Every structure is written in C-alpha cells, then in structure tokens.
Amino acid sequence: MPTWRYIFSLRSKSSFTKTWVPFTQIRNSSKSPKVGQKPILQGALGPPLDFIRPKEKVTLPPLLKEVSFQQKKFADCVLLTKVGNFYEMYFEQAEKIGPLLNLRVSKKKTSKSDVSMAGFPFFKLDRYLKILVEDLKKCVALSEEVIRPVDDLSSKNMYIRSVTRVITPGTLIDENFMNPYESNYILTVVFDPNFFSSDISNQGTAEDKDCFADCKIGLSWLDLSTGEFFTQDSNLQRLAGDLTRISPREIVLDESLKSFTTHPIYSFIQERKYFLSYVENRYQSLDCWNKFLEKEIDPSFIKYCTKLEVTAGCTLISYIADRLQNSHPNIQPPIRVSLNEYMIIGESAMKGLEIRSSLYQNRYTGSLLHAINKTVTKSGSRLLTRRLCAPSTNIVEINNRLDLVEKFKLLPELCSKVINLLKKSNDTHRILQHLLMGRGNSYDLLKMADNFSITKEIHSLLSPLESSSAFRLLLLNMHPHDELKQLINNAVDENALMKQKINEEEETEVIAQEAEEILQDENAQVEIVKKSLSSEFDIRQSFKENWVVKSNFNNNLRKLHEKLQSLFASYDKLQEDLSKRLGKKATLRKSPAKLYYVHLKLSGNETIERFIKKFTQAVLFQSTKSTASFQLPGWTSLGMDLENTKLHIHQEEQRVLKSITDEIVSHHKTLRSLANALDELDISTSLATLAQEQDFVRPVVDDSHAHTVIQGRHPIVEKGLSHKLIPFTPNDCFVGNGNVNIWLITGPNMAGKSTFLRQNAIISILAQIGSFVPASNARIGIVDQIFSRIGSADNLYQQKSTFMVEMMETSFILKNATRRSFVIMDEIGRGTTASDGIAIAYGCLKYLSTINHSRTLFATHAHQLTNLTKSFKNVECYCTNLSIDRDDHTFSFDYKLKKGVNYQSHGLKVAEMAGIPKNVLLAAEEVLTLLPNTSKPTSMK
C-alpha cells in the first residue's frame, strides 16, 4: 500500500528541493522473514495531518535568480557573472552578445525552462572587455563572489554574489587593453538650466542665435588611471573645440537631455560618436568632494569656480563612485583650466592642421603628433599630446621649456644617456594610482623601486647643471626616495615573483585546455571536476609557495618560515618511519577530497594488518583491490599545522605589503612631482633629438604681434617627402610686422598655398609648446587662438551643405578672432557662384583688416580680390606659380612664394595631371576664352 515520504533533490551546489511522494513499505522488510511467513504489507498511511500539498511552483536555481535580479538592477549593462573559472552570460544577453563575441551559446537545463548561456575563461576577461567596452560600446557589470558583510544575517553562506564594478570606456583603471600613450578621460557636460527652455537655435534673429552660442556650460573631466581632475567654464560655441582638445572616452549628460532628441545640442554630441551616459545632475558643496580627494581643494579654485563647474564636478564624482561600487576612487585636487593660460585651437583647426590624426583615414600616422613624437615613456607621450592640443600662452613657461630643449640639444651625449635611462622607467602616474586605489601588487612595488633607481642615476647626471635655472626646479622635484627603494628591495623577492609568473602562465594553459574541453563537450565539466577532487599531490609540492616577501624581512616571517621548515622535517621523519616499517608502498598524501591520509599499495591482506599493528590509531576509510587509504591522527595534525603555518605566512606577507604600500602612498605628493619631472625630461630630450635630426631652430617667443619665419617648413609634409627622397621647398612669412598683418595669396592648385598656410599655424603651435621649429629663424608673438578655414565637407547629419559649413566656420572666426589670433583661410566663397564668392571673400578680408587685426594668411583663386584690396594698407599680395617648358609643353610647380599676383590658376593643367580626357580639356580651353573676366589660358597644344 502506498504511503508518503520526503524526497530531497539536489538542484545546484547550494539548493535542495523537498517533496512528498508515494512509497510502499513492507513491514519487517529490514529483517529476514521467518520460514513460511510472508511479508506483511504496511497499511495505507497518508501524509502528516499538518501537511498541505503545495501547488507546483517551478522556479529558477538560486544562481539564475540572482543573475535575473542583477540584470534588472543594471539594465543598461551586459552582466558578466563569475562562476568558478568562467565569466558567464545568461538569458537574452547570452543570445544577443554571445555571437558578437564569437562565443558558443548553449542551453542550461533547469526545472523551469532551458536557459541560454555563454561564457569564457576568467583569464580572458580583458580580451572580451575590450570588445564589449571599446569596440561594441557596451557598459559591463562584473558580478563576483564576495565575503558577506558581518551585519548581513539573511543567510548562513559566507559568500554572496555582488556586482563589484561597472565598466565603461571612461571608468577604466588598469585594464591591459587601455592605450598607455593616451589619457582616458571621462567628461561631464552641464548646461545652463535655461538652455533647453528656448528654441532660438532653430529660429530667431542673429542676436538671438549669438545668445544661444554664448550659453554657459560647465565642464569637468578626470582620468581614473592617473587621478587627474579638471574643471572649466565654457559656452556652446567653444564646446566643439573643448571636446576635440579633451578627447573624452565617455561623456556624462543629464538624463533630462534624453527628452530633447530634436534639440541641436543632442545631434551635435551624437554626431561625434562619443560614448554617452546619462545621470541626474547633482549640485553639492565642494566639501563633499574632499572625501574623494588626496588633499583639500586649493582656495583659489573655490574663489573662481562657477556653479556650473561645481555641478559638473559633483555629478562626475557621484557617477564614478556609483560605477566603482565598492572601490574608493582616489582623485587629485581639481585644476581649473583658464582660457587665458593656453592657446585655443578650435575643432576645425584641430582637424585641418592634423594635430592628433590625419585628414586621410583619421589615423595617428600622418598627424603632427606622429611627426614630432620621439618620447620614450608612456606618460611623456600623454603629456606631449595634451600640450600639443593646448599650447601655453605663458611666455616665462614657454622659454623655460625652450631652455631645457636647448641645453639637451647642445649636450647630445647627456641627452642620449638620459633617454636610455628613461626608456627603462615605468609609468609612475598609473602605478601610484593603482596603489592609492588599493589595486596595486608586488609588481607595482618593484616597478616603483626601479623608478627610484633610475631617478637617482638621472639626478647624478644632471647635478653638474644645477646652477642652470632650467634644471634647478627639475632636480628639486627628482627626489630619489632611497629609503622607499631600500624598503621595497629588502621586502619583495623578485626571483620568487618571476617563478610565480611562470607558474601562473602554466596554470593558465591548463585552465585554457580544460575550458576548451568544456566548450567542446558539456559533459567534460563533470569529468574535470571529478578529476580535480580525486587528484593527489606530492606534499612538498602542495605546500610549496613562491613567497613574495623575503623570509628574513622581519622576525614574524623568520619564525614562521623556521616553523614551516621544522614541520617539513617532521613530515620527512614521519614519511621515513612509514617507509622503514612498510616500505615504499606507504606514502603520506593530501587531496581536496580525502584531506590528509596514508596511501598503501596492497600486495595482500598482510600489508593492511601490518599497518594496523604498527599504527593502532589509523582508521581505514577507503580500499580497493590494489590500494587502501587510512586516516592517521599524527599526519592529520601535522598537515593542519602545515596548512595553518602557510596561511599565517600569507597573512603576514599581506600585512607587510600593505604596510609598504601605505608608506609609499604617504609620499604621494613628492611622487607625483617626481613623475611630472620625468615627463618633463622625456619631452625635453625628445624635442632636442627632433631638433637635432630635423634641423629645427629655437624660436624667439615674446609678447609682440609678429610672425616672422625664415625658410619655414611643414613638418608633416617634409617627413612624407623625405621617404621619397624629395626635398621640401621652404618659404618665408612676415605677418604682424609693422603695418602688414594680412597676406593675400594667389596661385595655381597643387602649388603649395594650403601647405604654406598650415605650416605657419603649426610653427606657432610648436613654438608655444616649447619646441624648436622647422625654420632657419623664427620670431613668434604669443598667439591666443588659431583659426582655420581650410576644406569643408557636407554635414548631412545636420542637413548642412558644404557652403553652409564654410560660412558657419567663417562666421565663428570673424566673431571671435582677436589681434593676438592667427587666422588661415583658404578659398572663402568657393561653394557658391563666382560673383557671390568674390563678394563674400572681399567682405571677410575687409572685416579682418579693419576689425579683427589678426595675423592672417588668406589664399584664393579669385585674383580680382587683389585689385579690390589695393587700398588696404595692411594687406600684401604674394603668389605661387608653375614653370612651363615651351618645347615639350610640360610644367612643374616651384612651390616658392613670391611677392605679387598670379592671375592664372592653371586649373586645366591640374586637370591634365589628373588624367582628364584630352577632348574634355580642349573643349574646356575653347569655352574658357569666351567667358568674361578670365585670363587667356596657356595653350594645351
């Protein structure tokens, strides 16, 4: 007859289900029935009176429940859950993201339904984070097992699963895929609250639109990998240039902006393809920043910082703290960027002059940065990039930099020695940040010690120059920190670290192989787990550690290591005793499943009997035909002592390493000064090398309005031509000298007009970063802004034609250029009819001549402008030309700028060079003679 009983079913490692099922019991079935007596069936029994049959409720296993909860909580993220040695995705995320990562999507069977899942080994996390965060522009949440807080009594489990960090492009810290040569900024943009209440952006008067362009904006940005923190007051018309200069990896906007998708600012940011995040703007007092800062905010910052900047900073810090979850961000005190401190290079100029990337394919190769960058350290390269995007306007600062470059140029042997030492140095900025955020390791400590040694050597090399003002401040900041170096070297065992690295690589290979087996066959995971549980190790190997801290560093470690050696001696003695009594058939072993036991190879029952006689306390717990396993109290006690001693050594090492780390970070102020000094040396020596190799000259940088360049060259073009063994044709330029501040340049296409315009703007930029310049002589008066109107393209995203883009850029220049600005304009008015274009170009020239008074290079094909501007006393005409061989009708460009006007643009010649069919050229030549206001072309025959 049926009765009922509880059945327990294992659903997962930490989950059981309990149900009542029918069960027929036979009375006395546990005993042998008497002869002739049949078993008596037990009467029908029901479930307990208080039992109420529950409704069948099918639920997910606890792990998947937690995953589902976290996916809802972090709805904007791809959730990666660490399970054993894997990071896994589940449900729809596995189906959508798995194929993008080239991962196999499988089904995990549950009582509720089959659940999609995909995963990868934990040591490949950086590889897949790069794809998710950098390539796919996804936000990633990492869920891992962490120790349950003491006050959390919701479960008896020691560990809970929690999201430990949310990773976005702007919140990277020490990931291997970070570009070490570029800053990793996250930027918050906060607009004036009234900005979105008006619609003057799309309609209204010109004055209304000017008000719109002047709308106040607060900016705040930081690099978590270095702790650098900045704020700036800006406005809408400068925002594009600010974004190009800062080049953030991520922009944080107020969530209310999501509802303004038709607003111009939304499309303005969207079209630049930044990674966007949205949060609620927060305004708090500056006091709330202090708990995240290394030291208190400078009073001058508090005095000048605007409310919008404070809001941007509060929003950014709050966002960072939320993304880091349990980690504490460590940030340097904020620096307020003032427009008066650096040369402003707008978005158009940054692109047109190819400062960071080439116009062709938008690549690093072919850019100005690529042409001049000879730095040998990662942090030096980052600093050079920042300076190139925001050259200084401080004459004293510029000349101090030039002094350093000149000294190293005059002392090439010293320069070479310093460079060779810098090549061996490590990224102090990012290493220190790792330590400050509690993410450092023993390798970081050794790298820091290496930097101290290198600093001491460099300091020794430069000491004879201490009397020079150029080196005095550098040497003051280059503290070698001998005591910290000694502390690290006394503690950290470098050889052990190397062995540890080798062991980790070997373990990684094993895990990778097992992972591949699991991916190929789902049942392989069970076999691998069984294998790991039953595997047996050599005792010395199982207790062997590549200890990070030297055993003689302090008394505690010395005693613990002595105790460990004593325990190993006891182990050897016990093993020797076993061997004497039982031979080599008996060994002391340890395994995850059996813990500490004695393993016997059996040759008959006498072996077991002999063992029991010799070791009366031994307990047999497992045997086969050929082996037997015994628990021996003496070995169990010894094994536990070994384990505890090993644990105590590990704890003491962690205490020592933390103590050393705390000591290092307590010197963070001087260490940051040291890092800055090494960066300064890297840039100075690299620019000295550049000047030596490329024949650059020291410019005179002063407070005048002069731009005097003799035999100037374009560094990017010159570098490209040198690969083809073609010499670059240099040219002079004199604007801002005396009464003349505008050069009106005519000449044919391909004759070098645009190159000439760009090279002079670049020479100003190089001079103000503290570099020598490509010329035989140069005098540069401080430039406050560089404006460039060279080449435009349709902006289909905002439904603007090429001509409209050109006119907007021109309008921006005319409204913002000052007497200290340097303006280059090429072919203004080319996007409309000839007469309209000439009229617009003339109007611009007149405005620049009478209102702006900027140093200006103005190139045009409209030679009529030279006649229209004859009355302008501050305008001079220069031209380029080409040479024609009358015998064979060939021509070539001489690229030399001469005083005068070229009335022929030779467009047909350039068309011929481009391969335009002969008949087309003849027809064009014929009709050209019939058009009014044209010059007679050179014969094509």
Swiss-Prot record:
Its main location: cytoplasm. The keyword tRNA processing does not apply. Keywords: ATP-binding, Cytoplasm, DNA damage, DNA repair, DNA-binding, Mitochondrion, Nucleotide-binding. It is found in: Cytoplasm; Mitochondrion. GO terms for biological process: mismatch repair; mitochondrial DNA repair. SUPFAM superfamilies: DNA repair protein MutS, domain I (SSF55271), DNA repair protein MutS, domain II (SSF53150), DNA repair protein MutS, domain III (SSF48334), P-loop containing nucleoside triphosphate hydrolases (SSF52540). It comes from the Eukaryota. Involved in mitochondrial DNA repair. Belongs to the DNA mismatch repair MutS family. This is MutS protein homolog 1. It comes from Schizosaccharomyces pombe (strain 972 / ATCC 24843) (Fission yeast).
